[in-house]
C-alpha cells in the first residue's frame, strides 16, 4: 500500500489498511499465508473473496471465503452484490462494503476468468485440431465423397 508524495510513491506504513494486510490480516493467518491463499485462488479459480470484518466502521479482519461458495451478480442498480454460502450452510447477499473481491482477467467486468477452465478449452481445441489433421493427412489429404 503506497501513497503519493508529489511524484514519489512511499509506503503508507501508517495506514490502518497497510498494517492489516502486512502484519495481521485475521486471527488465524500470517500475512504470508494470506497472500499465498490470494495468489493460489487467483491462479486456480480466477477470483479471491474475503469477508470484511468491521469494528468501529474500520476493516479489522479479512476472512477468506471459498471462491466456490460465492456467486457475484449485478443488482437492479448495476452494483455488484455477492451471494455467499457460509461454512455453516447459511446464505446471504452482501455488497462491496462487506466483500473484498480480487479478480483476474475478466470478460464481463464482474467475474475473473478461471485460468484452468480457460486453458482446458484451449487444450481441447488444440487436441481436436490435431486429431482432425492426423485423419486428413493419413488419407493423403484426399477428401472422400464426391
PLM features per residue range, with description:
Residues 1-146:
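Structured, contiguous alpha/beta core segments that scaffold functional sites
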Amino acid at each position: 500500500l503506497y501513497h503519493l508524495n508529489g511524484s514519489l510513491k512511499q509506503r503508507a506504513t501508517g495506514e490502518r489498511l497497510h498494517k492489516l494486510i502486512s502484519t495481521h490480516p485475521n486471527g488465524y493467518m500470517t500475512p504470508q499465508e494470506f497472500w499465498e491463499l490470494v495468489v493460489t485462488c487467483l491462479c486456480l479459480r480466477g477470483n479471491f473473496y474475503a469477508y470484511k470484518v468491521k469494528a468501529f466502521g474500520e476493516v479489522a479482519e479479512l476472512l477468506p471465503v471459498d471462491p466456490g461458495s460465492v456467486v457475484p451478480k449485478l443488482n437492479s442498480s448495476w452494483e455488484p452484490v455477492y451471494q455467499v454460502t457460509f461454512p455453516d450452510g447459511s446464505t446471504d447477499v452482501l455488497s462491496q462494503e462487506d466483500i473484498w473481491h480480487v479478480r483476474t482477467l475478466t470478460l464481463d467486468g464482474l467475474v475473473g476468468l478461471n485460468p484452468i477452465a480457460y486453458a482446458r478449452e484451449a487444450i481441447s481445441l488444440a487436441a481436436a485440431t490435431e486429431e482432425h489433421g492426423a485423419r486428413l493427412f493419413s488419407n493423403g489429404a484426399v477428401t472422400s465423397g464426391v
